Amino acid sequence: MKKILISLISLIILTACVSTRYSYYPVSSYGINKISISAGLISEEDENSPVEYIGISDVRSNVDEPHKVKILSSSIKIIDKNKEYIVKTNPKSGYIYIYKQGVVITDDFKTYIGKVQLDGGTIIDIPPLSFKKNVYVESYNPVTDTINAGARTKRLFNGTIDEYREWKNK
């Protein structure tokens, strides 16, 4: 009985995991509150993973009522480490797949997307945006999360990569 109890306690304690996810967000939204812009990585768990896409979505969108965003520019400009890239867009998609077009970005970058149109007809001219790498770190335990549904994952950190390195070294 004692061995079972020790095994059970060890299982609960030793199965805790920490999940770290990386992504890019604009430093400032420049007052644009109708759309959300972010950039996703090929592998969000790898700090050095290149950017796969830039996504633009309508903040009104939800599962029951999706709203589309149409990129009006045929291409966008991306500046990374003083290199300038011109990337083609797909007017039928709110995503700009930059990695598929041979652009490899692993650091902070700037982009000019231009104009987008919401499905209601509203046109928004997005100013040049500076993207910074962000980190989201959470702790979870599959065993205790299952037993106690009210005590799910715990956010440990959410911020830029520079803030994360400073937090990690404390």
Residue ranges: model-predicted function:
Residues 38-76:
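Short, surface-exposed binding/anchoring microloops in extracellular/periplasmic proteins
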Residues 7-10, 39, 55, 114:
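Small side chains
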Residues 50-51, 82-139:
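Short, solvent-exposed, Trp/other aromatic-anchored flexible loops in extracytoplasmic proteins
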Residues 14-34:
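Bacterial Sec signal peptide processing site at the extreme N-terminus
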Residues 1-20:
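Sec-dependent bacterial lipoprotein signal peptides
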Residues 19, 168-170:
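Short, solvent-exposed mixed-charge patches
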Residues 121-167:
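Short beta-strand elements
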